[in-house]
Every structure is written in C-alpha cells, then in structure tokens.
From Swiss-Prot:
Primary subcellular site in the record, as a coarse category: membrane
Transmembrane segments: 92-112, 228-248
UniProt source species: Dictyostelium discoideum (Social amoeba)
Similarity comment: Belongs to the peroxin-11 family.
Protein topology in the membrane: Multi-pass membrane protein
Record localization: Peroxisome membrane
Record flagged with keyword Ribosomal protein: no
Gene that encodes the chain: pex11
Function: Involved in peroxisomal proliferation. Could participate in peroxisomal elongation or fission. May be involved in parceling of peroxisomes into regular quanta.
Tagged with keyword Transmembrane: yes
Protein name, UniProt field: Peroxisomal membrane protein 11 homolog
Length: 254
C-alpha cells in the first residue's frame, strides 16, 4: 500500500493528469465525466433530495456547455479525415464507404453542435430542438458505422492471433525437438519477429475492445436521444461515464 501511495508515483500521476488537461480533448473528457456523473447522481437523488437534484442538473448543464466550447474546431479534423478517405486506393470499397459515412456523421454532429452553441450565446437564431435531433442522428450513424468497422477489424485480429499463436507454439515444439545448429540465430530472429507481431495484434485487439465499449456506451445515449429505446437516466449516466473514462484512459500520457 505504501508503494502505491508513494510520492514518486503520485508525482507521476499528477504530471500525467496535467498533460491530459493541457489538451482541449482532455478537458472535454473530464467535463464529460462531470456531466454524466451529475446525471447519474441526479437520478440517484431523484427520490431523496430535490435540492441535490437541482444542483446535479446545473452541474450537468454547465459541463455540457463547457464541452461545446472545447469541441470548437473538431469539424476541421473530421474534414481532413473525409478528404483522406478519397485518396485511398479503392475509395468505394464497402469498408471505405462505411468509414466515409462514419466521418461524415461525426462532421455534421460537430457542425450542429457548433450551431447550437452559437444559438445559445445569441450569435445566430436556430431551432435548438431540431438541431439537437439532427446532431443525434449524425452521431448515431457515425457511432454505428464505427462499431461495424471495429467488429470487422476485430474478426481479422482474432484470426491473426490464432494463426500466430499456433506458429509460436509450433516453433517452441520444434526448438525442443531439434539440436542446436547453424540456423539457431536465424530462428531466434524469426521467432522474435513473430512474437513482436503477436504482441502488436494483442495490443490492437484490446484497443478495439475498448473502442467497442466506448462507442457502444455512446450509442446507448444517442439511441435514447432519438427515442429509439427509452433507457433510464441512470443508464445514460453510467454509459456516459464509461465512455469518458475509456476515452481518458486512451489519451492518458504513457
């Protein structure tokens, strides 16, 4: 316990947290935790304390508004990704079309989000209810395509993992059965390359699992906003927290 709470570890954690918060996307993740944490607590306090329900609602609204400011400019990043998709070898392949729908969905999600912010502060006059619905539709399809693409990539990674695992096992058996010969050094180099490739596949697979969990959690929120399925406020709060924590973990300075 003493080692876990030691000063060097605390300083390292604090340094990583500062680096995370130095990024606008890092601030967005922290604000998202506050936003959906407040939604969850508001649900818990619903039958206990009206005062704390009001406090949590204000925290949720304030955090959500702050996130809209920090997400300004995200359209530019999505625009670059969309343009890059037209430069690939076969831009109209099925997965590339899905990727185009995904990036277009996220692009318009940010556009509508910016317009809502502009309306809220008085720069423009739009129907924020309609903009919110359009934003949710764009977000929903962007997330859905992301999950489909990730599941396809996951299937490929699982096949590679199985193949490489069999190769590594077979190489170990061969090494135990054979005497040391002139090919030992070459075999060791080849085995190391295979093991490195295997480790990369495992890393990629775990990253996909995290992406699916994150996007799946966000999809629950988008589905509720579109009234596809009426998840409870508590479920929405938990989903938002899970998504934000995974996003923060993926951004955490290594």
């Amino acid at each position: 316990m003493a080692g876990i709470l030691s000063k060097p570890n605390y300083n390292q954690f604090l340094e990583s947290l500062i680096k995370l918060l130095a990024q606008t996307s890092g601030k967005d993740k922290i604000a998202k935790i506050l936003q959906y944490g407040a939604k969850l607590l508001g649900y818990i306090f619903l039958k206990r304390s009206k005062h704390w329900v009001d406090v949590m609602k204000k925290l949720e609204t304030t955090s959500g508004s702050a996130r809209k400011v920090w997400r300004l400019g995200n359209t530019l990043a999505e625009q670059q990704k969309i343009l890059a998709l037209f430069k690939v070898k076969n831009p109209f392949a099925f997965l590339n079309i899905l990727a185009l729908i995904r990036q277009s969905g996220m692009y318009f999600y940010w556009v509508f989000d910016h317009l809502i912010l502009g309306t809220n502060i008085g720069l423009c006059k739009f129907d924020t209810v309609k903009l919110g619905w359009y934003s949710s539709v764009s977000w929903f399809f962007g997330l859905l395509c992301s999950i489909i693409i990730d599941l396809n990539t996951l299937a490929i990674m699982l096949k590679k993992e199985k193949s490489l695992r069999l190769t590594i096992t077979q190489n170990k058996i061969n090494a135990n059965n054979n005497n040391i010969d002139t090919h030992t050094i070459t075999s060791e180099v080849e085995n190391k390359a295979i093991i490195d490739q295997f480790n990369e596949v495992i890393k990629k697979k775990n990253e996909i699992y995290l992406n699916c969990a994150k996007n799946g959690s966000d999809l629950i929120i988008a589905s509720t906003l579109l009234k596809i399925y009426p998840f409870s406020q508590g479920t929405i709060g938990i989903s938002g927290i899970i998504s934000a924590l995974i996003g923060a973990y993926q951004m955490w300075p290594k």
